[in-house]
Design a protein with these regions (language model features):
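Short S/T/G/P-rich N-terminal loop/turn motif that feeds into the first structured element of a domain
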Residues: 1-52, 59-70, 79-123
Length: 123
């Protein structure tokens, strides 16, 4: 497995959905404009829009550290609107682990797997 994958989750607080979506759009714009090493950054809502899941892929731990720094204040604001948790898949650096030390983050180390390119597909 190359890089790091994340699944981040928000249980959105009641009455905070529109504010959450506004900040989500801001996060997406910041990542799109400033993070060439963010390979995937996709947001999904459940059917009643009380939960949001973000699927993220970064080239390495430094790219994820840059992501945290880039979102900065916006990250704090959006985390105030919901209960946040995250799962990191891969082998994060010690520096990254220190950066997320106060957050609800679980780490799953890579064992083995399969990765294939999809012919003719682009995002």
């Amino acid at each position: 497995m190359k890089g790091l994958q994340l699944t981040s989750r928000f249980q959105i607080h009641k009455g905070k959905l529109e504010a959450f979506k506004t900040l989500a759009n801001e996060c997406i714009s910041l990542v799109q404009e400033n993070e060439p090493n963010a390979l995937q950054y996709d947001w999904f809502f459940n059917s009643d829009q009380t939960e949001c899941v973000i699927r993220e892929t970064f080239t390495d731990s430094n790219a994820l550290l840059a992501h945290i720094a880039n979102l900065g204040e916006v990250l704090g604001k959006i985390q105030a609107l919901g209960d946040f948790s995250s799962e990191i898949y891969g082998n994060p650096s010690e520096e990254l682990m220190q950066a997320v030390a106060g957050m609800d983050v679980k780490v799953y180390s890579f064992y083995r797997g399969l990765e294939r390119a999809v012919a003719g597909k682009s995002r």
